[in-house]
Amino acid sequence: MSIFNPAPAPWPSRMLSVLRIVTGVLFITFGTMKLFNMPPMPPGQPPIELMSQTGIGGILEVFGGLAFALGLFTRPVAFVLSGMMAVVYFQFHFPQSFWPSVNMGVPAILFCFIYLYFVFSGAGVWSVDAMIARSKADRI
């Protein structure tokens, strides 16, 4: 295999699944921090109210991250989470500075574009979506 040739057939879809799982699990931790204070919030942060914008974001992070990690309804979940991260960046990070490295918005941008990629690519081979598609194909 040359570094200039694409990877052999099974690996791109498998690595897409690994990226999806790792992204989903990391995203869940942002939500659990907001909803359950686990891992603990930085000192001096007030508790998050569940029905506030941040609380609803935490709910989306936990349940959307879980669905995304499992590969369940990946495309619609990724669409919602990508939009949420765009809102997060432009509402909370961008007003602080134009530069993402200064305004601490790099994770929001990365999550936004990773999710946007999955809107178009799908979940990959190791996902509930793929299992559902295989079972539907077997019935036909």
Regions found by a protein language model. Give the residues of each.
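Extended, low-polarity transmembrane helix blocks
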Residues: 1-36, 52-59, 63, 70-140
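Perimembrane loop-to-helix junctions flanking transmembrane segments
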Residues: 42-55
